[in-house]
């Protein structure tokens, strides 16, 4: 078994590839198979962002492994105006939906309930198959509503530096 614990900087060469959908790339513990059909065990640090397409890992035996985002069934969402697209993104965000944001479009995992909502909002949805690379979120960590154990959920901002003045 190829055992992997570490993420590393991009490399020019690699010995194996992992083709994983978004759900699998979001797990810190995973048993899967490489593209070369080798049994793989992922034991990554918990609380990190999902693996991204093109990211590199290093196995215990020193081999370099490249992560590839496997195509999956998605909804490609467009709207006739920026306002309507922003409104669609707002309603999807209220439902805590993983969302890939592009220039004039949104992508999310295929879901018939969300499709019906988007149709009611006047959005155009198209079923596609593509790698899914959703936004990780501004705070880069877990999500919770409880105040209990709040010190365990003190994630520094990743996109903004609130309260920092120049």
UniProtKB/Swiss-Prot annotation:
<dbReference type="GO" id="GO:0005737">
    <property type="term" value="C:cytoplasm"/>
</dbReference>
<feature type="region of interest" description="Disordered">
    <location>
        <begin position="133"/>
        <end position="156"/>
    </location>
</feature>
<dbReference type="Pfam" id="PF05194">
    <property type="entry name" value="UreE_C"/>
</dbReference>
<comment type="similarity">
    <text>Belongs to the UreE family.</text>
</comment>
<dbReference type="InterPro" id="IPR004029">
    <property type="entry name" value="UreE_N"/>
</dbReference>
<dbReference type="GO" id="GO:0051082">
    <property type="term" value="F:unfolded protein binding"/>
</dbReference>
<protein>
    <recommendedName>
        <fullName>Urease accessory protein UreE 2</fullName>
    </recommendedName>
</protein>
<dbReference type="InterPro" id="IPR036118">
    <property type="entry name" value="UreE_N_sf"/>
</dbReference>
<keyword id="KW-0996">Nickel insertion</keyword>
<keyword id="KW-0533">Nickel</keyword>
<keyword id="KW-0963">Cytoplasm</keyword>
<dbReference type="GO" id="GO:0019627">
    <property type="term" value="P:urea metabolic process"/>
</dbReference>
<comment type="function">
    <text>Involved in urease metallocenter assembly. Binds nickel. Probably functions as a nickel donor during metallocenter assembly.</text>
</comment>
<dbReference type="InterPro" id="IPR007864">
    <property type="entry name" value="UreE_C_dom"/>
</dbReference>
<dbReference type="GO" id="GO:0006457">
    <property type="term" value="P:protein folding"/>
</dbReference>
<dbReference type="GO" id="GO:0016151">
    <property type="term" value="F:nickel cation binding"/>
</dbReference>
<dbReference type="Pfam" id="PF02814">
    <property type="entry name" value="UreE_N"/>
</dbReference>
<dbReference type="GO" id="GO:0065003">
    <property type="term" value="P:protein-containing complex assembly"/>
</dbReference>
<keyword id="KW-0143">Chaperone</keyword>
<dbReference type="InterPro" id="IPR012406">
    <property type="entry name" value="UreE"/>
</dbReference>
């Amino acid at each position: 078994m190829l055992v992997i614990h570490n993420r590393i900087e991009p490399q020019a060469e690699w010995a194996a590839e992992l083709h994983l959908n978004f759900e699998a790339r979001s797990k810190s513990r995973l048993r899967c198979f490489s593209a070369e059909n080798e049994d793989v065990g992922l034991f990554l640090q918990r609380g990190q962002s999902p693996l991204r397409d093109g990211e590199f890992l290093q196995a215990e035996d020193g081999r370099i492994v490249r992560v590839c985002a496997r195509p999956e069934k998605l909804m490609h969402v467009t709207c006739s105006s920026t306002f309507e697209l922003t409104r669609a993104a707002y309603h999807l965000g209220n439902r805590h939906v993983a969302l890939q944001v592009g220039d004039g479009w949104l992508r999310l995992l295929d879901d018939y309930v969300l499709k019906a909502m988007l149709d009611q909002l006047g959005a155009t949805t198209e079923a596609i198959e593509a790698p899914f690379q959703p936004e990780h979120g501004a705070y880069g960590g877990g999500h919770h509503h409880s105040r209990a154990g709040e010190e365990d959920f003190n994630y520094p901002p990743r996109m903004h530096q609130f309260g920092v003045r120049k």
